[in-house]
Amino acid sequence: MYTVAWSYRVAAGREAAFEALYGASGAWCRLFAASPAYLGTRLLRDAGEPREYVTLDRWRTRADYEAFLQDNREAYAQIDRAGDALTESEARLGSFESE
């Protein structure tokens, strides 16, 4: 399995909109679900700092993830722009492989 982790600081008052976009029924998950290699996303909210979030996007393999990005650049960029309007910062924490 291949997991991509992202960290976000959400703009004050935009938490509900962020959760709607990045949550299990949000635009990101709907886009990713077009791929049979997509295994799901976990949206985590920091217990001590409610404007801090982490997402964990799970894929079968790195190659599957990269192929999906290549094939869906335009749709990915459109959703990413919508997310930019909700956040103060975004950082890729890393990519992780596991069995």
Language model region names:
Residues 2-9, 40-69:
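Short, well-ordered beta-strand segments in beta-rich or mixed alpha/beta enzyme
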Residues 10, 14, 30-33:
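Short coil/turn residues that cap or connect secondary-structure elements
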Residues 14-19, 64-66:
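Short, conserved charged micro-motifs
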Residues 19, 25, 45-46:
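Hydrophobic alpha-helical segments, principally membrane-spanning helices and signal/leader peptides
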Residues 23-40, 58-93:
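An amphipathic, aromatic/His-enriched active-site/gating alpha helix that lines ligand/cofactor pockets
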Residues 95-99:
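Short, low-order "capping/linker" segments at domain edges
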